[in-house]
């Protein structure tokens, strides 16, 4: 991959969400000094409709050429417009298997995926998204479903809970250094208090650890994820950072509690799921 501080791997298909994911990756790369690779896996069963082996091979080759041409056109267009180099590759195969093999081989710092409009309520139940959250220990950037950031320069950063805000992940620290806007911290309190107006810390000892932070506290209860999502949109966040649980209680867990999952599902803001490091 390109020689840069970070390496972004953008997973695409032929959906609009893939285009949004690539644009978000480009905007992020400009700010944090990252190289970009685009990877596209297409299942053969989407192409093959013949029993004759020769016909199958011919069809696969035609589809490979057509798919690579379409991908090259998309990547080259964005690369030329944004003046940033992008490398890309394409293959046929099982989507999850090929992606896992490619991640193992290239070791990207951030995997970037689009957010499809879910047929069901839970977007995070999507096969690839769920697989990555369970198995990939690095950062995952989930692009907004219908939102493309104009720039990550001076981006408005939001954090879901204190552990996300205080996380020492390097990419988050780099983004913090490149913004002058107050951070937004969204917390769900296990109390009977009402939703508070946004407040800022005023005590010196608190300022030293979480200075320049606006806090939104929500009562745990009915529709708290709706309330959080509403305030995320209202504050025009550019990126929401979410920390996975260090020790997952279940082997099948994606490392996000129910409230975090619901909030991600209901917001269009790009979400950076932070590395699951012990």
Regions found by a protein language model. Name each.
Residues 113-131, 226, 242-266, 276-278:
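Glycine-rich, Arg-bearing micro-motifs that act as flexible, cationic patches
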Residues 90-98, 221-225:
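Charged docking surfaces used in two-component/phosphorelay signaling
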Residues 85-88:
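Rossmann-fold cofactor-recognition segment
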Residues 2-55, 154-218, 237-239, 266, ...:
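Small/aliphatic-rich secondary-structure junction motif
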Residues 129-147:
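Short, structured interface segments
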Residues 104-109, 233-237:
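Glycine-rich phosphate-binding loop signature in dinucleotide/nucleotide-binding domains
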Residues 56-69:
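A short acidic, glycine-rich active-site loop
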Residues 112-115, 139-145, 270-276:
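Short beta-strand elements of ligand-binding domains
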């Amino acid at each position: 991959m390109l020689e840069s501080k970070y390496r972004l791997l953008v997973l695409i298909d032929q959906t609009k969400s893939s285009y949004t994911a690539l644009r978000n990756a480009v905007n992020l790369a400009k700010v944090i000094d990252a190289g970009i690779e685009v990877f596209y896996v297409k299942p053969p069963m989407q192409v093959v409709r013949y029993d004759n082996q020769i016909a199958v091979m011919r069809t696969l080759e035609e589809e490979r050429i057509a798919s690579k041409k379409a991908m090259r056109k998309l990547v080259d267009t964005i690369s030329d417009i944004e003046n940033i180099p992008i490398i890309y590759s394409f293959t046929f195969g099982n989507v999850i298997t090929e992606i896992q093999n490619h991640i193992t081989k290239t070791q990207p710092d951030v995997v970037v995926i689009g957010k499809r409009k879910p047929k069901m309520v839970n977007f995070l139940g999507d096969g690839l998204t769920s697989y990555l959250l369970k198995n990939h220990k690095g950062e995952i950037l989930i692009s907004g479903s219908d939102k493309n950031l104009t720039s990550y320069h001076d981006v408005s950063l939001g954090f879901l809970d204190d552990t996300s805000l205080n996380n020492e992940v390097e990419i988050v620290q780099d983004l913090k250094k490149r913004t002058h806007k107050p951070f937004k911290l969204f917390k769900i309190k296990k109390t009977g208090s009402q939703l508070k107006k946004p407040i800022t810390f005023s005590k010196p000892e608190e300022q030293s650890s979480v200075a320049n932070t606006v806090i939104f506290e929500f009562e745990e209860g009915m529709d708290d994820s709706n309330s959080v999502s509403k305030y995320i949109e209202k504050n025009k966040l550019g990126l929401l950072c979410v920390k996975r649980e260090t020790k997952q209680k279940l082997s099948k867990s994606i490392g996000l509690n129910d409230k975090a999952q619901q909030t991600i599902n209901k917001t269009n803001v790009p979400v950076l799921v932070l590395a699951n490091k012990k």
